[in-house]
Design a protein with these regions (language model features):
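Short, structured patches in soluble enzyme cores that scaffold and shape functional sites
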Residues: 23-27, 34-37
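Acidic, His- and aromatic-enriched active-site or binding-groove loops in soluble protein domains
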Residues: 33-51
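C-terminus-biased signal that marks the final domain/tail of proteins
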Residues: 6-8, 12-17, 26-28, 48-214
Length: 214
């Protein structure tokens, strides 16, 4: 908390909506920072999930609306003299919201993250996190009406990232290239390297590897 007092938040893009920050350390402790009416608000984030508006406290309260959800498959039951059975596995999550609004994304992230199995290695955990994050890709155009032509990608998912705090490695993929890349922070001499902006994609194109069958 003492270090946060030295941070200055500067708006860069006037199109930016309300911003929410999630900060974590290698022990797993997380806090959320939201600025409301110019005032910083800090919350302990024991769930480890964060999306956009409304505020974090609202999202945590909204979780109670989905108390009926659980991982696994619903057991068969009878309705009068009719036997009812699940159509498929995972029906315990029947009713989980699937739209792209922040409240729905928060619910999906909360249940997917808490139901995922513990992995033995860091890279396995990173790969699993990307599988979860695949559920939150927003395609270009979905925020526009049918009469509008998208001229930009303000709300589409431009990149997805996962961070290994223990080994200090940042993994990411982009909307142009779904291959996972990484930045090893330990390999960077922050005392010597100059401040710079590096594009996430040197070439905005998805590489496709041909499979040959002889």
């Amino acid at each position: 908390m003492k270090a946060i007092k030295k941070i200055h938040i500067v708006p860069i893009d006037p199109r930016a909506s309300t911003v929410h920050w999630r900060m974590a350390d290698i022990t797993g402790k997380q806090i959320v920072l939201e600025i409301v009416d110019g005032q910083p608000n800090f919350y302990e984030n024991t769930l480890g999930v964060l999306t956009n508006s409304p505020g974090f406290e609202w999202h945590m309260t909204n979780l109670n609306n989905y108390i009926n959800l659980y991982s696994g498959t619903t057991n068969p039951r009878t309705l009068g003299n009719i036997k009812l059975s699940s159509f498929g596995a995972g029906s315990g999550f029947l009713g989980i919201p699937g739209d792209i609004t922040p409240p729905s994304r928060f619910i999906r992230a909360a249940f997917y993250q808490t139901s995922s199995p513990q992995k033995e290695t860091a890279i396995e955990a990173v790969i699993q996190s990307f599988h979860i994050l695949n559920n939150f890709d927003i395609p270009i155009g979905i925020e526009f009406s049918e009469s509008e032509t998208p001229t930009d990608i303000p709300s589409a998912t431009q990149w997805t990232s996962s961070t290994d705090l223990t080994h200090r490695v940042i993994y990411y993929r982009t909307m142009y290239n779904s291959d996972i890349r990484c930045i090893d922070l330990k390999a960077i001499d922050f005392y010597r390297v100059k401040y710079q902006a590096v594009p996430l994609d040197l070439i905005k194109q998805q590489p496709i590897q041909p499979v040959r069958i002889n």
